[in-house]
């Protein structure tokens, strides 16, 4: 997993609440376990019409937001069914941080497990970020170490994050990476177990 320290990028305002995982990536795109190529399914029913043509007024289809790396979204983002493809699709599109007032628990966990940073801010700060991202300057800075978001106008917005999750994001550690940090202890345990319970070696 890639470490997340600081992100300076374009922010796209998605002024919709209760976006569920089926809207983030519909079920027809879940037939693969590959993480690459899922961007084509991201917000598919919002981005394309029944004939597969782009819907020009959807935010991520607008030229100024097509390269967005930060998504500013409405409350309760990522609700609905559990699908790890949701953060995969966002990341494959280039979005590495989602800012909202709240996230569904499973989606929130899946984000941290895959290196996508979910940032929770107050309704007032979200409204400010939404409004500013719709202006001529769409650039924001997300600093995980400092736990701040700097808005397009330069306002600094703080956010809270679990310290363990913060450390893992800063170091780029997923569950496997964290386990491998204890490789010496695991090897020692296996050596002792081989002596005390040799029948398990068969």
Swiss-Prot record:
Q: Name one GO molecular function term.
A: 3-isopropylmalate dehydratase activity
User: What InterPro entries has UniProt attached to this entry?
Assistant: 3-IsopropMal_deHydase_ssu, Aconitase/3IPM_dehydase_swvl, AconitaseA/IPMdHydase_ssu_swvl, IPMI_Swivel, LeuD
List the Gene3D superfamilies hit by this protein, alphabetically.
Aconitase, domain 4
Q: Which Pfam families match?
A: Aconitase_C
UniProt keyword DNA-binding, yes or no = no
Q: What is its EC number?
A: 4.2.1.33
Q: Keywords for this entry?
A: Amino-acid biosynthesis, Branched-chain amino acid biosynthesis, Leucine biosynthesis, Lyase
Quote the cellular component terms of the Gene Ontology held in the record. 3-isopropylmalate dehydratase complex
**Gene Ontology BP annotations:** L-leucine biosynthetic process
This enzyme catalyses: (2R,3S)-3-isopropylmalate = (2S)-2-isopropylmalate
EC top class, as a word: lyase
Physiological role: Catalyzes the isomerization between 2-isopropylmalate and 3-isopropylmalate, via the formation of 2-isopropylmaleate.
Q: What is said about its interaction partners and assembly?
A: Heterodimer of LeuC and LeuD.
Family as reported in the entry's similarity comment: Belongs to the LeuD family. LeuD type 1 subfamily.
Protein name as catalogued: 3-isopropylmalate dehydratase small subunit
Name the species this protein comes from.
Caulobacter vibrioides (strain NA1000 / CB15N)
Highest lineage ranks of the organism? Bacteria, Pseudomonadati, Pseudomonadota, Alphaproteobacteria, Caulobacterales
Query: Which gene name belongs to this protein?
Result: leuD
């Amino acid at each position: 997993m890639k470490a997340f320290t600081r992100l300076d990028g374009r922010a796209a305002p998605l002024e919709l609440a209760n976006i569920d995982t089926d809207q983030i990536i519909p079920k027809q795109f879940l037939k693969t376990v590959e993480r690459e190529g899922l961007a084509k399914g991201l917000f598919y029913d919002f981005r394309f019409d029944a004939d597969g043509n782009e819907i020009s007024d959807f935010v991520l289809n607008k030229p100024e937001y097509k390269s967005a790396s930060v998504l500013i979204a409405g409350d309760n983002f990522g609700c609905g069914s559990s699908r790890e493809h949701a953060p995969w699709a966002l990341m494959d599109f280039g979005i590495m941080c989602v800012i909202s007032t709240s996230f569904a628990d499973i989606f929130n966990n899946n984000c941290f497990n895959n290196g996508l940073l979910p940032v929770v801010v107050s309704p007032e700060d979200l409204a400010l970020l939404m409004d500013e991202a719709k202006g001529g300057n769409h650039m924001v800075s997300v600093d995980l170490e400092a736990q701040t978001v700097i808005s397009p106008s330069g306002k600094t917005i703080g956010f809270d994050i679990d310290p363990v999750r913060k450390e893992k994001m800063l170091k780029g550690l997923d569950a496997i990476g964290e386990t491998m940090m204890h490789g010496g202890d695991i090897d020692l345990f296996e050596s002792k177990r081989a002596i005390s319970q040799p029948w398990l070696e068969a």
